[in-house]
Each structure stands twice: as C-alpha cells, then as structure tokens.
Amino acid sequence: MESIVNAIITSTNKIFENQARIANNITNISTPGFKSELELKILLPSQKDQNSQEDNFLYKQYKNKNQGTLRRTNQPLDCAIIDKNDWFVIKIDPKTIAYTKNGHFKINSNRQLTVQNHPVLGEDGEIFIPKNENIVISSDGYINIIKNNVLQHKVAQFKLKNFDINDLTYKTNGLYLLNKNNKLNHTNHKNVSNIKLVSGILEDSNVNLEENMVEMISNARKFDMQIKILSMYNENTQAASRFLNLNY
C-alpha cells in the first residue's frame, strides 16, 4: 500500500515542478530575449517493453535555443543581438556578472546605462551616457554621439560574451549566470570581437503561449487524477480497516 502513496507523491512532485516551469515561461512572455524552458520525455531503456506509465519515463528540462521574433520599436536605446550565442554582460551586484538577451536599455538618474535596473557593461566597464546628446547605437556595438548626422564621439562599446545557453543557468527576469560546474569563467572567456547588433529593435521572448496553456491544463488534469486515486486509496483503506474490525 505504501508503494501506491509513494507513487502518487512522486507523480505529484513532477506535476508541481512542471507547473512551476510553465508558470515561469508565461510570466516572462513579455521579457525581451527570454528563452523558454521545455520538457523532454524519455522512455527508460529498461522499460521499453512495458506499459508506458509515468514512472517509466525520465523527464528532463531544457532551454529553447531558438531566437525570438525581432520586433521594431524605433527606440534609440533598444537593440537586439544577431548571433543567438552572444549575450549582453550585466553587473547585478559588485561580485556577480549575469548575461541577458534583453536589449531594452534605459538611462538611470546617474546617467548610467541599465537593463532592469542593473548596469550594462562595456569593454571599459560601466557605461555612462552624456546628457542632452543624440545617441545612436551602431551595428558593431558602439554607442555614438551624433550631431548633424556627423559622428562626434564614441561613448563606449558593448561587451558581449559568446556562450551556448546550456553553459548558463537561469536566474530571474531573463538574466542568466554561468554554470558553477562549467570550466569557462567570465574573466578568461574572450569577449566577442565581431559584434553584430540591430538598433531600434528588440528580440521578443520565444515563449509559445498556446503550447504553455495546453500544458498547464494537461498538468491540472493529471493533478486532479492523482487526488482522485489518493481519495480512492483512502476509502479502500478505511473499508478494509472496518472489515477487519468486524471480524475481531
């Protein structure tokens, strides 16, 4: 009997984990550059000749590498990265570097270039934008001051790093950290030398809302089924207990 309860607990935990993944995808559907997480269902080799029950499968979550739709905004501080393996470098605290595809940049009260309130890093460190200047981001990643269609000054060049998304661990709000067990690290990994950006454009998230909603409904049904099985198990246990009490 305990094996039934353990199976229900295991299945329910899988459902909760999957539901958390789906909820995170839907929450970040409007986060520029966010990469959705998908689930891979693998039939265990030793179980191929048995009935296809849930316990016979291995579930593995993985990141969707596909680039999101490039959407024109015409905002001078918006830009998207062309190469799917290139990432903007963000400082989320004095000791922590993160990576993002989110090119929806803003200037804070200190004239610092930020994304989601975190400083964006250039080749020479944090980037500060002069006041009352016409800013243009060029395709090679330079932030330029333009006056009368003439280049006056290059403020900075974005620092980009090249990582496969599997080298990164998701943190929050479209920000990723380098895997702790990865042999690479921020300091010894070379910066991208051939930067390719498009300005006035953002990369949308690659979340498929319809697919995630279907998965969420399916998970809810699976959860209801587990609750019904548990209820039936409790009823059968109580009936067996009453039967035994009548015979003693």
Swiss-Prot record:
One term under GO cellular component: bacterial-type flagellum basal body
Domain of life, per lineage: Bacteria
Signal peptide feature range: none
UniProt keyword annotation of Manganese present: no
Major location category of this protein: other
Subcellular location: Bacterial flagellum basal body
Subunit record text: The basal body constitutes a major portion of the flagellar organelle and consists of five rings (E,L,P,S, and M) mounted on a central rod. The rod consists of about 26 subunits of FlgG in the distal portion, and FlgB, FlgC and FlgF are thought to build up the proximal portion of the rod with about 6 subunits each.
UniProt xrefs under Pfam families: Flg_bbr_C (PF06429), LlgE_F_G_D1 (PF22692)
Gene Ontology biological process: bacterial-type flagellum-dependent swarming motility
Family: Belongs to the flagella basal body rod proteins family.
Name this polypeptide is given: Flagellar basal-body rod protein FlgF
SUPFAM superfamilies on file: Flagellar hook protein flgE (SSF117143)
NCBIfam families linked: PRK12641.1
Organism, scientific name: Buchnera aphidicola subsp. Baizongia pistaciae (strain Bp)
Record's keyword terms, sorted: Bacterial flagellum
